[in-house]
From Swiss-Prot:
This is Partitioning defective 3 homolog B. Keywords: Cell cycle, Cell division, Cell junction, Membrane, Phosphoprotein, Repeat, Tight junction. Residues 201-289, 383-468, 496-585 form the PDZ domain. Residues 79-104, 138-162, 334-374, 718-743, 787-927, 968-994, 1050-1203 are annotated as: Disordered. The keyword Ion transport does not apply. The gene is Pard3b.
Length: 1203
C-alpha cells in the first residue's frame, strides 16, 4: 500500500506496507522524506498541522491508515514552512513572515500577543455578507466575540448579570417525575428570549375542571431536524368543549404546558404532562400558530450568544447528565464537504494556511450505521419531493463496494449547506434511497443514480422514497436499574458553547468522540470528547476540552438517547442546521476543579505550591487557552512531547477563555501533544459509527498513562480513581527513578517488596513486567545454583545484578512509584546499610584475591595446568556444595519473604567465609594432588590391586597435587626424619574432610598410623608394596618409564628415602618430594592414550613456556620441614640432558634425583613413526619395541603426560 502526501506542489510517496500504521506515523514518515528533498537548505523548517483528504476531511492522527485511506490515495499536508533568513510563502499562499523557531523570539512574541493584533485581520467574503451572518469585529485584547447584533437582550443581560453564571432553580421543572430528559429540555428551552417566544405563540388559559377538550393530537416533528417540538392538533371533535369555546384550531401546535416545555419529549411524556396539568384548577397552554411554525423551528436551534456574556458560555447548575460507568465507544466526527461554492468566513481567522483542493471522488464516506445493514427491515419509508433550484438538489450519495450480489445499496452521504435538500429539511445523512421518480434503484450502481438525478432540469421536482432505520440500536431497558451518572450533579458544571463552523471549511467540528457504556449492563451512558483535532472548529474556538460530556446539540438534548442516536443527532446538526447558521451550539458537562484540600492530602504538592501552579496556569490561559488542547505538530528539530497539563479548569471561574493567539506564536504553543494514550482502539473503515472501546471517563484529564501498543491494557475502574488522586497532586512534575529502592545484597527480598507495593498502583490489569532478578541475592544462593563463579567474581557479579535489576524497574518506577512513601523509605534505608556491608565484604574478597595472585605469580606453573586445576576444582566444588542445597534453599525462601535481618546478614557473612575457605582448600588440594606413577618392574598378575576392577572407582588423581616450589633449584637440605609433609603450609587435612573426599569416590579411608614422635610406622612398608604392585601393573601394560637403551637403574626396595603411600582415592603414590611433582603428575594411572595426539604435538607444546624440569641431584630426599642442609649423595651422576646441562660437581646438587627412573635417552635419537608404535606389543621386553622412549627430552613423554 502506498499513499501520496502532497506538500504544496511536491508529492511525497510513502510506502505503508499493509496499512496498519497510524496516521501520525504516516505524517512523520512523510515529513522525513520531504525534508530529505530540501537537504540543500539546512535551516529549512517545516511543521505539519494535520493531513486532509483532497475533498477536505481531516484525518485523525490516531486512526489506522488502512481504515481511512485507500491504496494510492492522495492526502494534503497542512503545514507551515520557513526558509532560512528570508520571507517565503507557504503552499497556501499565506506569507510565513517568521524565521525558524527561536525560544527567545517566542517568549517576546508571547508577551506582546496581548497588546498587538499582529496579522489578526478578518477575511470578509461576499458569501458571508449574503448569508446574513453578522460580522463581529473585535480587538485582539477582547476575550471573546461580542453578542449578536440582532439578538434581543436576555433576562440575564437585562438584570446586569451578564458576566455571572445563570443558575436556574432545578425545582421549578419537577412537577412530574418523568425522566430527567424533560427537565433538561425545559432548562434549554428557557434560554430563549421570552419576547421572541411570545411573538410566535399565543397563550390559552383553560380550566382543569369540566368536560374533556375533545382534540386529537399527534407528535409535532420539526421539518428541519425531525425533533419532537410538541403536540400537533390534528383534529377537533364536533360539539366538543374546544369547538364550542374556540380554544384551538386545527394545525396548531401546543409547545408549552404550565411552563413545561414539550421540546424533545416523547409523545407519551407529553400526554402525561397534559394529564397532570389538567388536574390543576387552571392550565396555561402556549400554542404555536401555523404561520410561525418554520420560524419557531429555526429559533429552537438557538441564537448567537444567548446570554450576552463575554465568554459565550452559560454556567447552569448541573443538568442531569448521562449515566455512567465506563466502557467507552468512540466515533470520529469529520465532515466531508461540498465540492462547490465559497465558504463563508468566520469571526476568527484560520491559523492553518489554506492549501489548494484537488478534485477527488469520495473515499471516506461519513455515514450512519445504516450503511452496515443495507436491509429495509425495521426501516421507515418516507417520500420526499425536492424541487431542483439554481443550487442543485444539495446532497451527495455514496454506496458500498460492489459485492458478489451486485451493487450495494445507495445512501445519502452529506446534506450540503446550499440546495433543495437543506431547504426541505427532511432528508438526512444516512438515509437509504429506494426510489427516484417512481423507479426502483435497488441493484443500480451509484453512477446510474447520479445520472438520473442530474437529468432533472432546473425547476422540476424529484420524488425520492427513502428508508430510514429507526429503533434498532436502542438498548433494552432493565427494570429497576439504578441511575448512575458518569458526572454527578454536585461534581460537574454545565456550559453552553457557541462554536463557529464556517472558517473550518469541511473539517467540521473537528473532534473525536467516545461513547461511554456500562460494563455491567451494557447501557449507553453518553458521549464524550476524546480528542480535539488540529484545524477543526473546536480547536480554533479553544474552549472544548477532552472528556467533556455532550448533553445537547443545537438545543436538542442527547440525554436518554443511545450513543448511536446521540452520534446521529450531532452529525445531523453538523450537516444541516449547523451549516445554515454557520454555528453550532453545544451544551456540555465538565468536571470542575478538585478541591485544594483533597490535593494536599496526596502529599506530593503543598497548598502554596499548588496555588503557584494554579496562578501560572491561569496566566497562561489568559494569554492562550488553546495551549491545553493542541493535537500535535511536527518539527524536524523538536521531538514530540507528552505534556501533562491540567484540563480541569482550575482558574476557569475567574478567567474567561480567550481566542487563539496569533499564528506567529502557534509553533511554540502547539509543540505539546495531548497524549490520548488511555484507549485501545478498534478502527473500522469510513464513518459508519466507528465505535471503539476506551478507558473510563471518570479519570481526570491529567492522568496521562504511557500509550501502550500492546493489547494487555485492561482498565480497572477501581484503581483508576485512586491512582488519579495520587497523580493529580503535581501535574507538571517528573517522577524520576528511585534507584535506591533496588539496592540490596538480597535482591529477591527487596524486589518482591517493591513489586508488592507497586502492583496496586497500576490502573490496569496487565501481565506483570518481567522483574529482572539478580543472578543471585548472595553467595549462598549462587553456590547452590550457579557453579561457574569463583569467589571474587561473585562479588562483581552481584554488582552487575544490582544494575540489571535497576534497569528492569526504571520504566515502571517512573510511572507508578509514589513519592514520599514511608514504608519504601525504610526499605531504602535498610538497603543502604546492606549495601555498605556488602561493599566491605567485597573489599575483603579483593584482598584475598590479591594474596592469591601473588602466590600464583611466584609459582612457575604453565597455563594448561592452571586451566585443568580450575576446571577440576569447579567440578569438585559442585559436588561439595551439593550437600548444602537444602539449607541454602531455606535461606533463599527466607530472603524472599521480607527484609533481610541482622541474623541473616551474619549468616551470609559466615557462608561467604566458609565457601571461600573450602574453595581455597580445594585449590590447594588440586595443586598438591597426590600423583600416581609406575616403576618398570614385572610382577605376578594376582598381585593387582582390586581398585582397578572396582566399577565405582572414580579415578580422581589430584586431591593433593602440590603447587610447584617457588624455586626448583634451591640448594638441597639434609634428610630429616619426621612426619610426611602434606600441604605446603604443613597443615594436615582433618580426618572428617578426608573421609568426605573418600566418600565421593566410594573408597574407604585408611588414615596412616603415626607414632608419638611423628615418624612413619609400619604402614609405610605397605605403601611401598602397593607402589611396587602398581609399577608391575604398568610394566604389564607396556610402559617403560624413562628407560635407557642399555641400563636400567632401579631403586633399592629397602631404600627408606623413597616413601610410597595410599592416597585418599585409593591409589598408591609417592608423597611429596620437593621439585618432583611435575614428573609424578605425568605418570599415568593406566591405559594408553592415542599416540596420534602426541605425534602431532609440538615438542614444547605441553610445557606452555614454563621451564623444563631439571633434576641434577643424584638421589631423592624427603620434603624438608625446615631449611636444614641435605647430605650429598655421590652414588650416581647426572645423565639427564647432557647437551643442555653439564653435570655439576657432586657437592653442588640443586635438587632430588630419581633413583627408580633411569635417565632419558640422548636427544639425537629419532621419534618413531605411527606404524612402529602400532607394532609394539603390550608385553615385549626389547627396548626397540617401545619407540615412545626415543623422543626429544624437551618434549613431555606422551604416554605419561596424560592426566
Amino acid at each position: 500500500m502506498k499513499v501520496t502526501v502532497c506538500f504544496g506542489r511536491t508529492g511525497i510517496v510513502v510506502p505503508c506496507k499493509d496499512g496498519q500504521l497510524r496516521v501520525r506515523e504516516l505524517t512523520q514518515q512523510a515529513l522525513q522524506r520531504y525534508l530529505k528533498t530540501r537537504d540543500q537548505d539546512p535551516g529549512y523548517w517545516v511543521k505539519i498541522h494535520h493531513l486532509e483528504y483532497t475533498d477536505g476531511g481531516i484525518l485523525d492522527p490516531d486512526d489506522v491508515l488502512a481504515d481511512v485511506v485507500e491504496d494510492k490515495d492522495k492526502l494534503i499536508a497542512v503545514f507551515d514552512e520557513q526558509e532560512p533568513l528570508q520571507k517565503t510563502e507557504s503552499p497556501g499562499g499565506n506569507p510565513a513572515d517568521r524565521q525558524s523557531p527561536d525560544a527567545f523570539e517566542t517568549e517576546v512574541a508571547a508577551q506582546l500577543a496581548a497588546f498587538k493584533p499582529v496579522g489578526g485581520e478578518i477575511v470578509v467574503t461576499p458569501s458571508a455578507l449574503k448569508l446574513g451572518t453578522p460580522l463581529l469585529v473585535r480587538r485582539s485584547s477582547d476575550p471573546a466575540p461580542g453578542p449578536h447584533a440582532d439578538a434581543q437582550p436576555s433576562t440575564a443581560s437585562l438584570s446586569g448579570q451578564s458576566l455571572k453564571p445563570v443558575v436556574l432553580d432545578s425545582t421549578q421543572n419537577v412537577e412530574n417525575k418523568e425522566a430527567m430528559n424533560g427537565e433538561q429540555a425545559g432548562l434549554l428551552s428557557l434560554h430563549r428570549p421570552k419576547d421572541e417566544l411570545s411573538d410566535m405563540t399565543r397563550a390559552v388559559e383553560i380550566s382543569g375542571e369540566g368536560d374533556p377538550l375533545g382534540i386529537h393530537v399527534v407528535p409535532f416533528f420539526s421539518s428541519l431536524s425531525g425533533r419532537i417540538l410538541g403536540l400537533f392538533i390534528r383534529g377537533i371533535e364536533e360539539n366538543s368543549r374546544c369547538k364550542q369555546e374556540g380554544l384551538f384550531q386545527e394545525n396548531e401546535c401546543i409547545v408549552k404546558i404550565n411552563n413545561v416545555e414539550l421540546l424533545d419529549k416523547t409523545f407519551a411524556q407529553a400526554q402525561d404532562v397534559f394529564r397532570q396539568a389538567m388536574k390543576s384548577p387552571s392550565v396555561i397552554l402556549h400554542v404555536l400558530l401555523p404561520q410561525n411554525r418554520e420560524q419557531y423551528e429555526k429559533s429552537v436551534i438557538g441564537p448567537l450568544n444567548i446570554f450576552g456574556n463575554n465568554d459565550g458560555a452559560s454556567r447552569t447548575k448541573a443538568a442531569p447528565p448521562a449515566r455512567g460507568k465506563p466502557g467507552l465507544k468512540a466515533v470520529h466526527l469529520t465532515r466531508a464537504s461540498s465540492p462547490e461554492g465559497e465558504e463563508p468566513a468566520s469571526p476568527q481567522q484560520s491559523k492553518s494556511p489554506r492549501v489548494p483542493r484537488l478534485g477527488r471522488k469520495p473515499s471516506s464516506p461519513s455515514l450512519s450505521p445504516l450503511m452496515g445493514f443495507g436491509s429495509k427491515k425495521n426501516a421507515k419509508k418516507i417520500k420526499i419531493d425536492l424541487k431542483k433550484g439554481p443550487e442543485g438538489l444539495g446532497f451527495t450519495v455514496v454506496t458500498r463496494d460492489s459485492s458478489i450480489h451486485g451493487p450495494g445499496p445507495i445512501f445519502v452521504k452529506n446534506i450540503l449547506p446550499k440546495g433543495a435538500a437543506v431547504k426541505d429539511g427532511r432528508l438526512q445523512s444516512g438515509d437509504r434511497i429506494l426510489e427516484v421518480n417512481g423507479r426502483d434503484v435497488t441493484g443500480r450502481t451509484q453512477e446510474e443514480l447520479v445520472a438520473m438525478l442530474r437529468s432533472t432540469k432546473q425547476g422540476e421536482t424529484v420524488s425520492l422514497v427513502i428508508a430510514r432505520q429507526e429503533g434498532s440500536f436502542l438498548p433494552r431497558e432493565l427494570k429497576g436499574e439504578p441511575d448512575c451518572y458518569a458526572l454527578s450533579l454536585e461534581s460537574s458544571e454545565q456550559l453552553t458553547l457557541e462554536i463557529p463552523l464556517n472558517d473550518s471549511g469541511s473539517a467540521g467540528l473537528g473532534v473525536s468522540l467516545k461513547g461511554n457504556k456500562s460494563r455491567e449492563t451494557g447501557t449507553d451512558l453518553g458521549i464524550f470528547i476524546k480528542s480535539i483535532i488540529h484545524g477543526g472548529a473546536a480547536f480554533k474556538d479553544g474552549r472544548l476540552r477532552m472528556n467533556d460530556q455532550l448533553i445537547a446539540v443545537n438545543g436538542e438534548t442527547l440525554l436518554g438517547k443511545s450513543n448511536h442516536e446521540a452520534m446521529e443527532t450531532l452529525r445531523r446538526s453538523m450537516s444541516m442546521e449547523g451549516n445554515i447558521r454557520g454555528m453550532i451550539q453545544l451544551v456540555i458537562l465538565r468536571r470542575p476543579e478538585r478541591p485544594l484540600e483533597e490535593l494536599s492530602e496526596c502529599g506530593a504538592l503543598s497548598r502554596p505550591g499548588f496555588e503557584n501552579c494554579q496562578e501560572a496556569l491561569s496566566t497562561s490561559r489568559r494569554n492562550d487557552s488553546s495551549i491545553l488542547y493542541p493535537f500535535g505538530t511536527y518539527s524536524p528539530q523538536d521531538k514530540r512531547k507528552d505534556l501533562l497539563l491540567p484540563s480541569d479548569g482550575w482558574a476557569e471561574n475567574e478567567v474567561p477563555p480567550s481566542p487563539p493567539p496569533h499564528p506567529a506564536l502557534e509553533w511554540g504553543l502547539e509543540d505539546f501533544s495531548h497524549s490520548s494514550g488511555v484507549d485501545s482502539t478498534g478502527y473500522f473503515p469510513d464513518q459508519h459509527v466507528n465505535f471503539r472501546t476506551v478507558t473510563p471517563v471518570r479519570q481526570p484529564e491529567l492522568i496521562n498513562l504511557k500509550a501502550s501498543k500492546s493489547m494487555d491494557l485492561v482498565p480497572d475502574e477501581g484503581k483508576v480513581q485512586s491512582l488519579a488522586d495520587r497523580r493529580s497532586d503535581s501535574p507538571g512534575k517528573d517522577f524520576g527513578p528511585t534507584l535506591g529502592l533496588k539496592k540490596s545484597s538480597s535482591l529477591e527480598s527487596l524486589q518482591t517488596a517493591v513489586a508488592e507495593v507497586r502492583k496496586n498502583d497500576l490502573p490496569f490489569h496487565r501481565p506483570r513486567p518481567h522483574m529482572v532478578r539478580g543472578r543471585g541475592c548472595n553467595e549462598s544462593f549462587r553456590a547452590a545454583i550457579d557453579k561457574s563463579y569463583d569467589g571474587p567474581e561473585e562479588a562483581d557479579a552481584d554488582g552487575l545484578s544490582d544494575k540489571s535489576s535497576r534497569s528492569g524497574h526504571t520504566a515502571l518506577n517512573c510511572e507508578s512509584a509514589p513519592q514520599g512513601n514511608p514504608e519504601l523509605d525504610n526499605v531504602e534505608n535498610k538497603a543502604k546499610n546492606i549495601k555498605k556491608t556488602k561493599e566491605k565484604e567485597k573489599k575483603k574478597g579483593k584482598g584475598k584475591l590479591k594474596v592469591k595472585e601473588k602466590k600464583l605469580k611466584e609459582e612457575h606453573e604453565d597455563a594448561e595446568r592452571k586451566m585443568k586445576r580450575k576446571g577440576f576444582g569447579a567440578m569438585l566444588r559442585f559436588g561439595k556444595k551439593k550437600d548444602d542445597k537444602v539449607g541454602k534453599a531455606e535461606q533463599k525462601g527466607a530472603q524472599k519473604s521480607g527484609h533481610p535481618e541482622e541474623e541473616e546478614l551474619e549468616r551470609m557473612k559466615e557462608e561467604r567465609e566458609r565457601i571461600g575457605a573450602k574453595h581455597q582448600e580445594l585449590r590447594e588440594k588440586q595443586a598438591r594432588g597426590l600423583v600416581d606413577y609406575a616403576t618398570a618392574v614385572t610382577g605376578p598378575v594376582h598381585d593387582m590391586d582390586d581398585d582397578e576392577m572396582d566399577p565405582n572407582y572414580a579415578r580422581v588423581n589430584h586431591f593433593r597435587e602440590p603447587c610447584a616450589s617457588a624455586n626448583v633449584f634451591r640448594s638441597p637440605s639434609p634428610l630429616r626424619a619426621g612426619p610426611l609433609a602434606y600441604p605446603r603450609d604443613g597443615r594436615p587435612l582433618s580426618p572428617d574432610h578426608l573421609e568426605g573426599l573418600y566418600a565421593k569416590v566410594n573408597k574407604p579411608y585408611h588414615p596412616p598410623a603415626l607414632a608419638d614422635s611423628g615418624r612413619p610406622m609400619a604402614g609405610t612398608t605397605d605403601r611401598i608394596q602397593k607402589l611396587r604392585k602398581e609399577y608391575y601393573q604398568a610394566r604389564r601394560e607396556g610402559f617403560l618409564l624413562y628407560e635407557d637403551e642399555n641400563t636400567r637403574a632401579r631403586p633399592s626396595d629397602h631404600d627408606l628415602r623413597w616413601v610410597s603411600g595410599k592416597g585418599p582415592d585409593g591409589s598408591t603414590h609417592n608423597l611429596r618430594f620437593e621439585g618432583m611433582e611435575r614428573q609424578y603428575a605425568s605418570l599415568p594411572r593406566g591405559g594408553s592414550a592415542d599416540p596420534v595426539d602426541y605425534l602431532t604435538a609440538s615438542p614444547r607444546g605441553r610445557y606452555n613456556d614454563r621451564e623444563l624440569p631439571y633434576y641434577p641431584g643424584p638421589h631423592p630426599v624427603h620434603a624438608p620441614r625446615g631449611s636444614y642442609p641435605r647430605p650429598p649423595d655421590l652414588r650416581a651422576t647426572d645423565l639427564r640432558y647432557p647437551q643442555y646441562y653439564p653435570p655439576p660437581p657432586a657437592h653442588q646438587h640443586k635438587g632430588p634425583f630419581r633413583q627408580d627412573v633411569p635417565p632419558s635417552p640422548p636427544q639425537h635419537q629419532r621419534v618413531p613413526v605411527y606404524q612402529e608404535m602400532g607394532r609394539a606389543g603390550p608385553r615385549g621386553s626389547s627396548p626397540d619395541q617401545y619407540p615412545y622412549r626415543n623422543q626429544d627430552p624437551r618434549q613431555k613423554n606422551p604416554m605419561t603426560a596424560a592426566v
